[in-house]
Amino acid sequence: MSSSLKKAAGSAPRLFERYVPVDHTRVSFDAGFWKSWSDTVRDVTIPTQHMRLDEEGFLEVLDFDKPAGPLARPIQPSGLSMQHFFDSDFGKWIEAASYTLKNNPNPDVEAKIDAIVEKLEHGQMADGYLNSWFIRREPEKRWTNLRDLHEMYSMGHLLEGAVAYYQATGKRRFLDVMIRAIDHIIDTFGTEPDKLRGYDAHEEIELALVKLYRVTGDPRHLKLATYFVDERGRMPSYYDEEARLRGEDPADYVYKTYSYSQAHMPVREQTQVVGHAVRAMYLFSAMADLAYENDDPTLKSACDQLFDNLTGRQLYVTGGLGPSASNEGFTREFDLPNETAYAETCAAVALGFWSHRMAQIDLDGKFTDALETVLFNGALSGISRDGEHYFYENVLESHGQNRRWKWHYCPCCPTNIARFITSLGQYFYSVKNGEVAVHLYGANTAELDVDGTFLRLKQDTAYPWDGDVRLSVGLSAPASLTFRLHIPGWCHKARISVKGQEIDFAASVEKGYAAITLDWKDGDEIRLSFDMPVERVYAHPAVGEDANRVAFKRGPVVYCVEQADIGTEPQRLRIIRDAALKPRFDADLLGGAVVLEGDALEADAGDWSGKLYRTSPPSLKPKAFKAIPYHLWANRDEGAMQVWLTEE
């Protein structure tokens, strides 16, 4: 438990609950789904990402003693080069790698991190400022364009990496570098007359500062995070002021509205999710963190409204979010196109961050349901099964033009999905006052400290392919504990047995969690069984793109149909209403997965005599089809894919 959380013990009663997530290093994946993915990311993804950073010239920007070379990424109309935030990719890679080190020491990875840290320390300015672009290219322009140039965003990701590396290894060098950088920001920004009253347009440093506070216990770090969130959206806008100081007309801002960066009004007044999707999710994650630390009901209330707006009006069935490429974000409510979906991997990952944080201050299954959806669908689709190829955009329909890439012009997503998976253990359990909240299911063993009681909790399950879960309790001495077990929102029928006896738990369910309070001893078991029928999913009528279409879901997994399995474009399929679909475990599909099989109809394109249109509908012929988990698509032969299928 972090120092700040320890200090909270014995304080005044709080307005809402505060669960403490288990440290990810205390959860080990023993078998099954997440062991396979975790091993791949640790053994393949982490080393190849460092290789790509080197091959693409990213590491060269840290050669502070050399003159800055030609730009690897040109300046865009906004005035931003992707190179402005190269530092953020080092930070996320270090963070992802660090999460693997405590349980799986790797001297080679540590040496690579230490080499980056040495260069960052060497290049840091005397006053603590740290940004490779401005130090090497434009030191006179630092802090002159918070609206466009991502200075604090990059420092935030470096800070997250520094915290993770310190927690994994105990090495303070990187942490101390970043504390000096934060000291500089504290000296530069704030409401005092001699400071700049600004904040970065790309949120990230806010949540990073909370992580730092939980390590240092320094109230200045929490105060700075609070300032950045409180100041956001204050009018007149700081961005207008700094634009005029640069000799620019604020009206020439390329995105025209500060809603792009959620700076159009104070955060507590915002009720609709707008703008750049990743920025929004990072901001809302920080708001949840500050509600947690400051016991701030106004921030929690704002988060609640924003969460309901997102999940009720703007979220893809896969957990993807942000339909538009033009602003990498949101347009209007119910605008959820499939083939042009942007649905950036980073945004889905960040929704996972936010959802998890919300569950710590309000144990509501709707937050955990969102976390589970992105984990098994809209975030996991961002990385290939071999751990070396990626999606930036996660479309829900393709005619074969979408292929995974080994790196990207703007490679923010690879390191983001990597850090999500390598830190996955923290999302499974939380503890509070003799309670253990079980959020997620998957084969693992966890070691938990529940108010001084050591608990070893082991999950045996083939989840998400099977709904049976066995929880084995390991205790050195009997103890009275409450288990709060998440009943997923997709589950309409569940059974729970405790110590060999099935129980009626319906009355104990509160907001999607079943509470079981008993005296427990070593060897006791809880068995859960979640029925997993294949379900047909339909979109709200306002989502015009999905009219007369159906999607398939089984448990938490969303399915798609891929041309590789049916030999034709799935866009020609007509799914027969109420036709049965059968789940089957296919051990040969990319490491093994449950597929869905059924009979449909196919529109015959062979009898059109070269015509594009005619007055009679196409003839239909029987067609067997197979659907695979959405997160596995584009791992095999090139071809079309579709999530929302036409229903006949």
Feature-to-residue mapping (PLM):
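Catalytic-core region of carbohydrate-active enzymes that cleave or remodel glycosidic bonds
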Residues: 289-313, 336-386
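Extended ligand-binding groove/face enriched in aromatic
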Residues: 63-83, 100-203, 207-264
